[in-house]
C-alpha cells in the first residue's frame, strides 16, 4: 500500500535533533507501539521512531482502540531511553502531553488547546490527540520507554461513537485547508524531545509547574471509575488531586470525565 510520507524529507525536517534520525516509515502496520517495542528489544537507539500512515489495531490507554484511517492523521511511536527511575513512567506521559499540547496550540491559533489529564489533548473540549506510554525494565532500571502518539490532523468525518467528542487540527483552523502531515509530525516530535529532556534534566517539578496552567477541567466536577469530585490540579508526582465529600484524594490512574453540575455541590 503506498503512502505519501517522504522519509528523506522527514529526516530533514527533524535535522539538528536526535529524535527521528532513526526512522521507520510504514504504509500500514497493526500497531506502531508493538513495532517500536520490538525495535527497542533489538537495540534501537534513543529517539528511534516508527511512523505509519495507517494502523489496523491501533491502541490507546486502557486498551481502547485508536481509530487510524489512512491519509489523514499521524500515528507514531518513539523508543526513548531516558535515565529515569521506573516509577517515572507516569511523569513521562505528562511531559509528552505538555509537549503535544504545545505543538497543537501552535497550529490552531486562537483556540483553546489543553491537556486532559493524564494522556489526551483537547481543542475546545474535543479530543485531538492521545498518548500511550509503556516502559520496559531490566532489573531496577528502565531499558526503554515506548511513547505512542496519535494526532488528528486532517480528518473531518468521524464514526458515530466519536462524533461530537473528537476534532482535528484542520477542523479547528479558520482556513480549513489540509495541513502538511510531515511538518506536523516534525513539530510534535521536536516538542516531545524537548520536554522529555527537560524532565530528565530538571525533574518532575518542572513538568508539574509548566503543566498545571495547561490542564483542562480544573475546578470542574468530574467522575472517574469509582468516584466523583472536583478536579483541583496535580500533585508533585503527577497524580490528579480531587476533592470529594470525604476530603482531598490523589488519583494515580483514572479516567476523568466532566459532569454538568455545580462544583459547589461538594463544598
Predicted ranges, named:
Residues 1-109, 264-267:
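N-terminal lobe of the biotin/lipoate ligase/transferase fold
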Residues 1-2, 18, 86-113, 123-267:
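Long, positively charged amphipathic alpha-helical accessory segments at protein N-termini or as interdomain linkers
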